[in-house]
Amino acid sequence: METQLQSIFEEVVKTEIIEEAFPGMFMDTPEDEKTKLISCLAAFRQFWSGLSQESHEQCVQWIVKFIHGQHSPKRISFLYDCLAMAVETGLLPPRMVCESLINSDSLEWERTQLWALTFKLVRKIIGGVDYKGVRDLLKAILEKILTIPNTVSSAVVQQLLAAREVIAYILERNACLLPAYFAVTEIRKLYPEGKLPHWLLGNLVSDFVDTFRPTARINSICGRCSLLPVVNNSGAICNSWKLDPATLRFPLKGLLPYDKDLFEPQTALLRYVLEQPYSRDMVCNMLGLNKQHKQRCPVLEDQLVDLVVYAMERSETEEKFDDGGTSQLLWQHLSSQLIFFVLFQFASFPHMVLSLHQKLAGRGLIKGRDHLMWVLLQFISGSIQKNALADFLPVMKLFDLLYPEKECIPVPDINKPQSTHAFAMTCIWIHLNRKAQNGDSTLQIPIPHSLKLHHEFLQQSLRNKSLQMNDYKIALLCNAYSTNSECFTLPMGALVETIYGNGIMRVPLPGTSCLASASVTPLPMNLLDSLTVHAKMSLIHSIATRVIKLAHTKSSVALAPALVETYSRLLVYMEIESLGIKGFISQLLPTVFKSHAWGILHTLLEMFSHRMHHIQPHYRVQLLSHLHTLAAVAQTNQNQLHLCVESTALRLITALGSSEVQPQFTRFLNDPKTVLSAESEELNRALILTLARATHVTDFFTGSDSIQGTWCKDILQTIMNFTPHNWASHTLSCFPAPLQAFFKQNNVPQESRFNLKKNVEEEYRKWKSMTDENEIITQFSVQGFPPLFLCLLWKMLLETDHISQIGYKVLERIGARALVAHVRTFADFLVYEFSTSAGGQQLNKCIEILNDMVWKYNIVTLDRLILCLAMRSHEGNEAQVCYFIIQLLLLKPNDFRNRVSDFVKENSPEHWLQSDWHTKHMSYHKKYPEKLYFEGLAEQVDPPVPIQSPYLPIYFGNVCLRFLPVFDIVIHRFLELLPVSKSLETLLDHLGGLYKFHDRPVTYLYNTLHYYEMCLRNRDHLKRKLVHAIIGSLKDNRPQGWCLSDTYLKHAMNAREDNPWVPEDSYYCKLIGRLVDTMAGKSPGPFPNCDWRFNEFPNPAAHALHVTCVELMALAVPGKDVGNALLNVVLKSQPLVPRENITAWMNAIGLIITALPEPYWIVLHDRIVNVISSSSLTSETEWVGYPFRLFDFTACHQSYSEMSCSYTLALAHAVWHHSSIGQLSLIPKFLTEALLPVVKTEFQLLYVYHLVGPFLQRFQQERTRCMIEIGVAFYDMLLNVDQCSTHLNYMDPICDFLYHMKYMFTGDSVKEQVEKIICNLKPALKLRLRFITHISKMEPAVPPQALNSGSPAPQSNQVPASLPVTQ
């Protein structure tokens, strides 16, 4: 091949001897040149046609090599003309020629003439190259230009500029050689943010990149760097807050020239999240950190160090380190964060200590030094045994810096808890010294002179063998010697002995013959807080080991109340999670269960129900799964344990947070049975109600009409297989539409009330006719017998006023688990009986018998009976009768009311501050003993039956606390039925005080007002009553201003029915300002300080958000008006809203409005329609400037030239950034139904792109269907605008954005719809968008790996595999 080629081309360039002798004197005529060209091409065409396809590239490369081997510019020029003609006549493919020319090793900038001629040829033929080829050529030319040094002779610059001209042609928008989006991607790869382009390209490249700033702006959320989340403890996080773990930057899609602040590390965001208590899961989610992979994260380390420095600065200004003060809470939280992140090796301890030293050097911050050493001691004492001494020595460097004293530091007052912090440095020295002595290290660290008095005090205290609990000496010794087993035994032994009891003394517990070890006073929280994590771990390990030992030995003596309460308190510490709650759920519970230690099992479940706080949702769902397993075991079929298991399960189900339900239940999609009850209809109904509430509050089903393809389907189907049931129409109407549709399709035939009555009469006749006792007992207690026995007992009491001994024996034989079905039938039977009652005397008789069954005979507990009644599905009049029975049971006799009022009056919900809970608990049970084994009936029968069943230990529970989760359900049922509103008000008046003991009163109120927003419209009095009852129940246990604002308390609580209070704008401003100040960490904050470990909410912002939403939903103002008033806080000029941090206010509005029901936030759509229809966007003459300046909120705001459109844009972004994907899923419908008909101008179109563009990434990740619909809507709008306009001024930014959308998000998923639209556009637009359609059947221009590198995505015929296809 080479020989043939050589002969063809040498023939055409050969010269005569005379020409060589007189170079430059001879010249071919144009005709001769042309003849040569034609003959050369003819010979080459013949050769080329005989060449195989595979050899084409090799052939072209040889030709280029041949040309570049020539030294005469004239020859090179002539041969290039040959190549040009070959390309122009279609003989050679232009892409192959261009690539061979540019990639030739001989093409060097020093050969200036060759360089100039080559790029002139490329410029001439590049128009024929396909867009993918042009993209590759652009990349190759840019890389070639990089070989030109920074300084060259000015003589050669002119020739080098030929390359620039090719680049200019490629980048020429009107030439449309390739999508400009590809060009900017290649340029930004070579010249990322902050890197200047090569001097040869001058401003050509930077000007071109600048034309993409509008596209970048369209894809950016206004003020994104100022938006902050509210941290919740469920760890639920959407993709909005993800950061790059190496740089802390936002993960931006595409290599666009985004605004500078978006490329900055988002330290403020991470720092804010780190500062929040219970934020560690969110931090891990934001940075993509996985506990299983030990990966050090230096940026996280830096922020932790900065937080410590900030705490040191705060301590410097605080007068005293008071109990529960801001500074103490901050140090407590810091300690917890540090241990977690260092323990999982996300941060390095020695690196952090050295960094701290560097940042504190020369600052003179020493007031907080003891607290800092206390934080460091936590980690050192727990990990020094497993790590090298060298890792901990940098602490001594820090000591030298922070403890400059030459004289001895005096011993602090050890009666105060702060003394443990003052001793922290001495404790650190003791641990370091112990490690040095034990290791091979010859290093001895002498005790610093300033710590000598502290050290001597500890030594002396250790010699005192009788340690008292009245000061902090024991804690000090535990902290100092926790790594020295000889010395540690004494103080730890003293702690343990205090709570275990001495083994001889006994104290009674509620119920018959139930005794416990005699220690009743738990270790106070102050003391537990004063122990290091290492000491706490030893203590909790000791307790868990003792519990397991007692479980194995099946001890008849119950655990000491002090031990149980202390164990509960230790479980609140997140730092000891592995031995704490994780060990409790994964090891202790299963071990106790296997040992059949039912008393201890009952105790552990009681602890979980009444003493646990902020337990992560996966542990709670794991426990729920355990409970369903437990419920099926024969040994748990006894009244007290069965009741406890069901009550605990009910609490777990109803307490699931709305954002927790989906992430937790999707973990069980393969086996939904594990989290559902096989036999308890009430628990499964409670789960469905929780599911309905969660999907409503999170707007999961918004825009959907079916549960097909969702995570709910299998769960609901399994429930209907286990416990088929129906829902009353008034309950069903509150469900989200897809759930309503499911239950209408899966309707279960109901037994008629008449049949029930007939069956009861039939069985009662049988009962009266039978005489043989054994036969009766067998007949009525056998499995498979209709569950009508309670109905028969009712009949006996109605007719004979007593129950025989056989009745008692049947009840006992039936067993706890089977009896639930009897209660269910009895609930239906009662409704029938009361419905058909003649009233008057007969009704009173019915009421008396029912109350006797509960309180006199103890046949069924009040909470179980009411739960069954509340969960039945009666309609109309029967539903009212059912609720009437509930009201009678709760209020008619004094039994329950007295129990409630005495319990509320004598007890406090702040159990962590109490030392005498056990005493109060026992006196309450003595006054109102729990009777769970039909004691009343056993005493009444003739002859009386002695009770055999011993009681399991009860440490915390009683009928009032057991009733609370049932009361939650009762209130909801009453809300659903309009005619029983007055009855609900009466219940709240008499029993509302119980909410003092609810573990999540504000969340319950928030969920209720949110879920029943439609039911409660125009029922302002009931709304007010509900809020007053629940919030008012806590008035004695919460400081003033903890929840509702003073303005609300003053006006709304006292408003008259005929004259409801309508707040002014200033009210809404103050309410938003309260959340803004809370999130900014203002000190003192708008809300009183509290110990967040025992609070309903994990941190101040979560508390502020929920109480604000409750107050707004409680107003006697329609949701639409409240929503508009919230938007007006920033959209109208408000004197109370400071200009300088307007985005913080928008952030707060976004958080609040998205946490409210749909009528509150949907008003934003109306505002957007108003702005889009306004003259500033519809009239071409109204705003003569640049639209991107008009939409740039930050620039407009800073220059005081803001307009309503930029404010509305920024506010919409803040709202949508905080929205759930369910709320966002209304955007496609909003675009097509509300905006598409009105968008006629370019400004309007660009405004819509600005609005929705930044959220395409969320749609791609979470709901692809919506992304596809939005993509099509964008093209429909473009068609509208194109048809309504004579000329488009901003065609390029529009097209750039559409290319970005295609290559980053939609791929080919919208190809078919879009092709039809593009065909109908005007030629100029159609030319620019031709690469999007497949009309020309052009290939994609990007390799598949580009998706991850920020380059355009590949095209395919389906939705890209990376897109999650969701509902």
Curated annotation (Swiss-Prot):
* Superkingdom field: Eukaryota
Keyword Ribosomal protein tagged: no
Protein's cellular compartments: Nucleus
Keywords in UniProt for this one? Activator, Nucleus, Transcription, Transcription regulation
Q: Indicate the secretion signal residues.
A: none
Locate the region Disordered: 1343-1367
Family to which the UniProt record says this protein belongs? Belongs to the Mediator complex subunit 23 family.
What is the purpose of this protein? Component of the Mediator complex, a coactivator involved in the regulated transcription of nearly all RNA polymerase II-dependent genes. Mediator functions as a bridge to convey information from gene-specific regulatory proteins to the basal RNA polymerase II transcription machinery. Mediator is recruited to promoters by direct interactions with regulatory proteins and serves as a scaffold for the assembly of a functional pre-initiation complex with RNA polymerase II and the general transcription factors.
Q: How does it assemble?
A: Component of the Mediator complex, which is composed of MED1, MED4, MED6, MED7, MED8, MED9, MED10, MED11, MED12, MED13, MED13L, MED14, MED15, MED16, MED17, MED18, MED19, MED20, MED21, MED22, MED23, MED24, MED25, MED26, MED27, MED29, MED30, MED31, CCNC, CDK8 and CDC2L6/CDK11. The MED12, MED13, CCNC and CDK8 subunits form a distinct module termed the CDK8 module. Mediator containing the CDK8 module is less active than Mediator lacking this module in supporting transcriptional activation.
- Tell me what this protein is called: Mediator of RNA polymerase II transcription subunit 23
